[in-house]
């Protein structure tokens, strides 16, 4: 037990130590171009020339958003065509067939929006070709899209008054060449050394200890797993994700993969401070997010290592903790840490089954995604926090009788309306779709039965499974309570719709706020200016997030994990 706690502490320490210098590097990449990866410039110039891009052309926020949305529409059709026809494409030694249109729609939308919700198993649902040219390609592009959006927001915040927020295509390319590619190579090298496969051979047939034969899937796993983690994508190469011994072979790879989930979102908060030359603001935001993250880690590690009281009543030894759904090579401590890390970001990868975690652990996992603000996905994590920051500035200004200002720009009704819509859209989507699915489950049992029955666990936990699915979809997370049978017409299409709304509405709103504030006249700070880089304001922002986001879900949480908790304890 002490060893497990030490492992958890070591991983958190690694994140804290490395996120600071990485944040400084990222700020240099977006601001000056005078970073240690500038030798990639010739490759970038080749890409610009090939695509007909002028990287020096400045865009206003509307042109920036137009470029962002256009490329995403293109990749959607690219992915749909390849996924449906993958059975006829090369690099398919196992003879896997194409996906059905509804599954391809869900898969394509899911990976295009950085969610990676998987209603299929990678071993049989994809080929090596689509793993590389749809899944891995999307994982780089969607991560870089979020980072490019944040780079545009940082540029707008840094300027005193400007009509432009940078060039989307330039930010997209350098996010890949100078941040995501190099880090993926390092992580991939470690995985290969530790035993993760990297090749294009078909399934292996091996004899088991009992004398039977077993087929084991392989493929270019080590190429895909690094960006799965670093890009907060989370879509597993294998069906059981990083629980699979070839996707996550050892405790070392577990540390590296778990570290990879959070390192860029953490570093981007520091990058904000360096870019704006307001390091104290970065520290305050980092502190608020870190506090919420550590609170979740403490809760989940405690409950998973304490075990299940119902199993205690049966007289079964639980000295190793609650081991249901856990890998024995990793243990409940490492699984609990991963469960918080993957839900506090938009990653969604797993090294154990979230459906088997204790009720309050499941509640923490859902709350992280329902709040969707603590570090979050690469780029979009701060952007979600940004909307609450605007609300907190406005409320704080009214409370103390000062003009609501953020970085020298007045926050007025227009920005507040957009921030409010962005903040309330998330709970609206989750709760409305959960209500619809619950209604269908109760009042259309024949339809539910025709789709396989949906739930393996009725009652409190069954409701939690449906709530978790839409929470995960709306938070662009992709993890799931896998007791839910979700590869059906109903779940593929409703989750796909939730994915689209929850990805693009916030990005459009947040970039619009940044563009509107950038156009405003800069007002120098004075004695009457509300300070946003203080601990007091950080606490205020934390409680605004808790009140607006977390409390919106309290009734639903009461019907699910909280009720389940009281049925066990």
Swiss-Prot record:
Subunit composition and interactions: The system is composed of three essential subunits: KdpA, KdpB and KdpC.
GO cellular component, one term: plasma membrane
Protein function: Part of the high-affinity ATP-driven potassium transport (or Kdp) system, which catalyzes the hydrolysis of ATP coupled with the electrogenic transport of potassium into the cytoplasm. This subunit binds the periplasmic potassium ions and delivers the ions to the membrane domain of KdpB through an intramembrane tunnel.
Mode of membrane association: Multi-pass membrane protein
HAMAP family xref list: KdpA
Protein name: Potassium-transporting ATPase potassium-binding subunit
Compartments where located: Cell inner membrane
Gene name per UniProt: kdpA
PANTHER family: POTASSIUM-TRANSPORTING ATPASE A CHAIN (PTHR30607), POTASSIUM-TRANSPORTING ATPASE POTASSIUM-BINDING SUBUNIT (PTHR30607:SF2)
Taxonomy, superkingdom: Bacteria
Membrane-crossing segments per the record: 3-23, 64-84, 133-153, 179-199, 255-275, 281-301, 375-395, 421-441, 497-517, 535-555
InterPro entries: KdpA
């Amino acid at each position: 037990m002490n060893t497990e706690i030490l492992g958890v502490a070591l991983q958190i320490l690694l994140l804290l130590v490395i996120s600071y210098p990485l944040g400084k590097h990222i700020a240099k990449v977006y601001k000056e171009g005078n970073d240690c990866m500038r030798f990639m410039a010739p490759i970038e110039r080749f890409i610009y020339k090939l695509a007909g891009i002028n990287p020096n052309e400045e865009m206003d926020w509307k042109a920036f958003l137009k470029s962002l949305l256009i490329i995403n529409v293109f990749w959607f059709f690219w992915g749909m065509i390849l996924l449906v026809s993958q059975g006829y494409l090369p690099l398919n030694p196992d003879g896997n067939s194409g996906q059905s249109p509804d599954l391809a729609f869900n898969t394509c939308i899911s990976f295009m929006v950085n969610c990676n919700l998987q209603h299929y198993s990678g071993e049989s649902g994809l080929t090596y070709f689509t793993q590389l040219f749809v899944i891995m390609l999307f994982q780089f592009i969607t991560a870089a899209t979020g980072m490019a959006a944040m780079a545009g927001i940082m540029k707008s915040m840094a300027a005193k008054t400007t009509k432009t927020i940078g060039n989307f295509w330039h930010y997209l390319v350098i996010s890949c060449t100078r941040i995501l590619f190099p880090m993926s190579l390092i992580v991939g090298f470690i995985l290969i050394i530790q035993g993760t496969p990297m090749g294009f051979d078909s399934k292996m047939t091996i004899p088991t200890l009992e004398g039977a034969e077993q087929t084991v899937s392989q493929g270019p796993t080590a190429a895909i797993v690094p960006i799965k983690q670093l890009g907060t994508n989370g879509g597993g190469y294998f069906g059981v994700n990083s629980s699979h011994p070839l996707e996550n072979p050892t405790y070392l790879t577990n540390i590296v993969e778990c570290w990879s989930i959070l390192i860029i979102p953490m570093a981007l908060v520091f990058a904000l401070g360096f870019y704006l030359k307001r390091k104290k603001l970065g520290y305050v935001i980092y502190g608020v997010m870190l506090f919420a993250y550590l609170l979740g880690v403490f809760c989940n590690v405690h409950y998973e290592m304490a075990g299940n009281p119902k199993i205690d009543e049966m007289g079964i030894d639980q000295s190793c903790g609650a081991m249901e759904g856990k890998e024995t090579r990793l243990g409940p401590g490492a699984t609990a840490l991963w469960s918080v890390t993957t839900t506090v970001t938009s990653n969604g990868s797993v090294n154990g089954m979230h459906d088997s975690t204790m009720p309050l652990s499941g509640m923490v996992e859902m709350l992280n995604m329902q709040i969707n603000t603590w570090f979050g996905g690469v780029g979009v994590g701060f952007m979600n926090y940004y909307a609450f920051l605007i609300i907190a500035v406005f409320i704080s200004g009214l409370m103390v009788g000062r003009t609501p200002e953020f970085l020298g720009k007045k926050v007025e009704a227009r920005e507040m309306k957009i921030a409010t819509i962005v903040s309330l859209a998330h709970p609206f989507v989750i709760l409305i779709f959960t209500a619809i699915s619950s209604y269908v489950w109760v009042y259309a049992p024949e339809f539910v039965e025709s789709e396989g029955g949906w739930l393996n666990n009725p009652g409190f936990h069954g409701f939690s499974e449906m709530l978790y699915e839409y929470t995960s979809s709306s938070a662009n997370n992709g993890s799931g309570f896998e007791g839910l049978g979700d590869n059906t017409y109903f779940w593929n299409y409703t989750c796909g719709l939730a994915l689209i709304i929850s990805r693009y509405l916030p990005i459009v709103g947040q970039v619009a706020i940044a563009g509107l504030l950038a156009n405003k006249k800069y007002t120098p700070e004075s004695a009457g200016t509300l300070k946003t880089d203080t601990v007091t304001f950080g606490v205020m922002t934390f409680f605004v997030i808790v009140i607006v986001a977390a409390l919106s879900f309290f009734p639903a949480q009461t019907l699910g994990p909280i009720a389940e908790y009281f049925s066990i304890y």
